[in-house]
């Protein structure tokens, strides 16, 4: 093991040795190369006043060499801002701005210590990093049966984890009891990664406050029994809450700093929160009992290991994307502009809900899972196969949706103008009539 990794592990153990036990074998070995090219280049940046031949970038004086045909597309951004490398941790102004946004949107975190977010290349990359750092082959990963298929690709196929599922719904509410029962199977000393995503993809469901607290209580009860709990909160669609009775803050708030046996990880992204899907800017933040300050050596070590894994695989994330998001977050009109987009999304949700309420005849062929948030809703066909309906919709009507499993069909009302929603459902109904003949 590299001495730098050994030092980071010592930092973790000095605060809470249980976190070291939670790490995967790679998570224990990984480190940020703070004494290599990057650190020497950083020293030279500060001290090499005459000549600096350290970093592999092409410069003209103090400006990044550039092609006008590139920079002509980036008015208002300098070549150095757009083209030079970002640190593996991410740009510090962006990390600070995102933490400020987390606190703005989650006021109950005001006095709760958690790490400074590390920048990732989108939400998917954040999930991948969590897997790399905390999951070994055969480890247990718990998630709902209605989940994003990329979870399977990452945790099951890539990392060879043992996936366990609980039924997401119990009638019109989330199946908290089923989640709790799965956790009860874990023995003291065993490790589990629990993945929870609200608003949920594919269903568009966010639990209410009581349900959310019950989920947190179940995780904390497992931690109190001695289970090593890594709770991954996937906040990809955070903020898009349309119903009055759904949680308004991240589940991370109910877990952060609550137990020495529970590491809460918040994975979120500018992707949906800033409406910048292709910029690929995500974040990872950590919190656990025993790390009593935001600059705790434990958080410093976890940030370093995260940055080290980024360095090892992609070196760093796009500086240009990070600059754009930083400028957006620090713009005085950011929250007002975000609210305008949220209200458009709310009207699409309302139209979807109203369309289903006004057409009870649709229930002959399909019913909707509970939904109150996010980008999606999901219907379940009573008898028809989802992929058969999908193909018929495409071939005859030029309409697209996502078949998930045998009966489930995901629809993204986020991508439809309000006036398109009712005709889409009527088209789905007509397709079902066609196939039932």
Where are these regions (language model features)?
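Short, solvent-exposed loop/turn segments at secondary-structure junctions
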Residues: 56-60, 124, 148-149, 199-202, ...
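Conserved PLP-binding active-site segment of the aspartate aminotransferase-like
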Residues: 375-384, 390, 397-433
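Conserved glycine-rich beta-strand-loop-beta hairpin in the small C-terminal domain of fold type I
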Residues: 319, 326, 338-353, 365-380, ...
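Generic structural signal for small/hydrophobic residues in well-ordered secondary structure
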Residues: 53, 98, 141, 155, ...
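N-terminal small-domain helix-loop-helix segment of the aminotransferase-like
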Residues: 2-9, 14-18, 25-121
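Short beta-strand
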Residues: 50-52, 87, 267, 366-372, ...
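Conserved core of the PLP fold type I
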Residues: 81-231, 238-258, 419, 426-429
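Conserved core segment of the aminotransferase class I/II
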Residues: 5-16, 256-343
